Amino acid sequence: MNLYLLLGALAIFSLVYDKKENSIFLYLLILFLVFIIVSPAIISKNTESTVEDIPSHKAKSVRKKLEIEQALDAILNKNTSSID
């Protein structure tokens, strides 16, 4: 959120600052520089993912089977405890 606020503020600043001249060039230059400066921080933040953050099709099916087994075990344990 702060990144978008910063980019918006810089865009408005660049348009106001260079209003008399060709402001599009300065606007694009500032946005490009901010993107180059901020992109390594965004990329390094996203590299700390684990296997659970990126589930594959196989991992999803295994997790679903495990949840079903746990639910069935809970039902069976409830039924056997009431018989005893």
From Swiss-Prot:
Quote the subcellular location field of this record.
Answer: Host cytoplasm; Host nucleus
What InterPro entries does this protein's entry cite? Answer: Ac76_baculovir
Q: Which UniProt keywords apply?
A: Host cytoplasm, Host nucleus
The cysteines joined by S-S bonds are none
Name the predominant localization: host cell
Q: Which GO terms describe its cellular component?
A: host cell cytoplasm; host cell nuclear membrane
Q: Name one Pfam family in it.
A: Ac76
Tell me, how does this one assemble?
Interacts with protein Ac75.
What the protein does comes down to: Plays an essential role in budded virion (BV) and occluded derived virion (ODV) development. Participates in intranuclear microvesicle formation, ODV envelopment, and subsequent embedding of virions into occlusion bodies.
**Name of protein:** Protein Ac76
Q: Which organism is it from?
A: Autographa californica nuclear polyhedrosis virus (AcMNPV)
* Upper lineage: Viruses, Viruses incertae sedis, Naldaviricetes, Lefavirales, Baculoviridae
